[in-house]
Amino acid sequence: MRKITPAPRLASILPRFFRVPVSLVVLVAFVQVAMNTEFADSQVIDVPKESSSVANGKNTAADTEKSPTQTGKDQVALGGSGVRCPEKLPGYRQATYDRIAWLVTHNAMSNRVEGWWFPNQTYGITRQLEDGVRGLMLDVHMIDGEAFLLHGSSIFGKVPLETCLAEIKAFMQQHSDVILTLILECYAPATKVRESLEKAGLLSMMHHQDSADAWPKVNDMIKEDKRLVVLTDAGGGEWRGYHDVWEFCQETHYSVKQVADFTYKRNRGNQANSLFILNHFLTRPVAGKVLAARANDSSVLQPRIEGCQSATMRFPNFVVVDFYECGDTLASLADFNQKWIGKQKQKSQHSRHESASALEK
């Protein structure tokens, strides 16, 4: 009889379904370490990776993050005006929702400080919002009959949708002039998403938009406290305020490996749609800070934002990035918005002046 050594014997009796996940875990752990190594040229603050229960669907006091102002270590690049958040821009309230370029985080829930594997962001939702992010791309899945946020597999991290939405509600309550957009990749029934929004207290804050109507001014959304716009790729239109993303938006391609491959070529959505999603992140084969630093550098991001309208005849409404604190995302958007809102303000003043002159005649 052939003698089997302990190691092969163990391998021979392990079920295949067990051996494969073990190999996957080893591979994931190796890549995770590699992707989260801090590179000197990325110019971004690193944070200690703590053991977090959020990535496993729980939220504890240990997961609380400090804002940049609390830490005194805010190295997120600001615009030339020193403005980080769009609310601080002159003319913000008089601009319409579709004439502001909003910074959006790709796979916003997947972040390093809360222990997610293969993260697309460094910080959690609250920190992102405090830093000036105003749009969140979230993947919604069902686990045991409940709506969760996860990306790819729950092994990489997960959090109940309601938990994330409650975090968003808390921020919006503290900042009454903030407009926020959620863009959902949704594998959950629309009823489950509605249930989570209602439990989090956000349902009453949702703006409803008819596709044939012009988007409202920011000031009107603030006065009516309808400051949350929700777009989804599944179940849109099933209830008021739950918008079909491809009825309102078009997007550029999102599978890009190097800066040279960035284009304005349309991927999904009708060309006539009113909102434009400018996907601006690199994946090779997963997201990483060095890749983000290249994509988010002002020499790359600024001309891409500014060239969007001339290339596509569409305003870059949602600029979607990984690791937003790498590079110059906030500075680039602040400078672009300041120029654009300034032009709109001058145009409005000129129109009022012409109207007044006509009345005098």
Spans of features found by a protein language model:
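N-terminal leader/targeting signatures
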Residues: I13-L14, V26, M35
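Bacterial N-terminal signal peptides
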Residues: P21-Q32
